[in-house]
Amino acid sequence: HFNNRDTDAEGGPLASAKIGRRRDELTRLFAHVAKSAPPDATVRGGSWLYHVEAYRRLFPPAYADSRKPYTRPIALRGTATWGQVIDAHERIRPAVRDVVLANLAQLDPEAPHLAFPFQMLAVEAPLSAFLEFYGLGA
């Protein structure tokens, strides 16, 4: 998961100018995964960030295009859901804040994540799709 540790004059971690950096990081990650995972492994993820094209473009199309509602339990810890409220400079996004605040009146205590505008999405694809996408062979 990317944190806001790469924000500068070129923008935040998902800025167009930084696609190469992010893909290099992911290439190194999947080179490591390929050494220990079985060839028929499936890569799965879950995040609200799969709503964002700038994030999806970092992954193989088969993975990014597999988006569907996340059905596992969702906990409000870390930035898995809260991250959508802040920008790359860790400032509050007023539009997102306003949606969350407006939704508090109907808040379901059993599902507080539903107050956020971008719900978590689940994605998955074969490891081979990642190896091919990052030029690591299949």
Regions found by a protein language model. Give the residues of each.
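Acyl-donor binding region in acyl/amide transferases
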Residues: 1-82
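Short, flexible coil/linker elements and helix-boundary hinge sites characteristic
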Residues: 38, 108-111, 135
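Accessory, usually C-terminal, subdomains that scaffold auxiliary metal cofactors
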Residues: 66-129
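Long, compositionally biased intrinsically disordered regions
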Residues: 128-138
